[in-house]
Amino acid sequence: MQTYPMPTQAVILAGGLGTRLRSVVRDVPKPMAAIGERPFLSYLLDECVRYGIRDAILAVGYLHETIQQYFGDAYKGMRLRYAIEDEPLGTGGAVKQALRYCPPDMPAFVLNGDTLFATDWQQLYQCYIQQGADIAISLRTMHHFDRYGVVETDSTGRVTAFCEKQYREIGNINGGIYVLSPLLLCNYPDRFSLEQDVLSVSIQHYRLYTHVSESYFIDIGIPDDYRRAQTELPQLFE
């Protein structure tokens, strides 16, 4: 199978307030929640390094100084830059602002800052190229769940529907890693939701394709999973 050079830019949405985590994590942005002796965000940056990212742009807002002071302008040889939200821009607005640091004609990876999905970025990017996708979306197969909505696709992997949360025996959820071009968001307003204003309403307008995996996935957005991350992440990724 032909392979293509990987993007070297990634955006991480690191501006989360961590509202649901306040019972166990206080006074830091959600991606800075401690996992053992280091912040959750460092695990995401390790994934970036592993896949050859040379330039990571952190979309930050709430207590952004905490992140900047901890990580500075580099991480394991990878340049770090910060796209600071002075007011909440939504996930789409935050991504759009951060992508201004990237070459407009080069695709970039985009990651949620409160989930870690150990899917294969190379395969996700191959999907983006080979399908001529506007956006490639990582999907995680889940079993017996009601916490997430599901993404339905056709036999080629193209998205046909985003479905609301309800109990399901099995389904594919959005894993929170994307490939897209900065040009895609140029005409959107400064404040919008990537999920609600782009993905959910653009199935007919954009070519949304998917790569499905059952690789390790964790969402630290609720206390129970955050506690689980304390043991699982050091065991799996140290």
Model-derived features: where do they sit?
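Histidine-centered beta-alpha loop that forms part of the nucleotide-sugar donor binding/catalytic region
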Residues: 15, 61, 140-141
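A generic "binding-loop/recognition-motif" signal
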Residues: 17, 28, 63, 216
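Acceptor/aglycone-binding surface of glycosyltransferases and processive sugar-polymer synthases
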Residues: 147-160
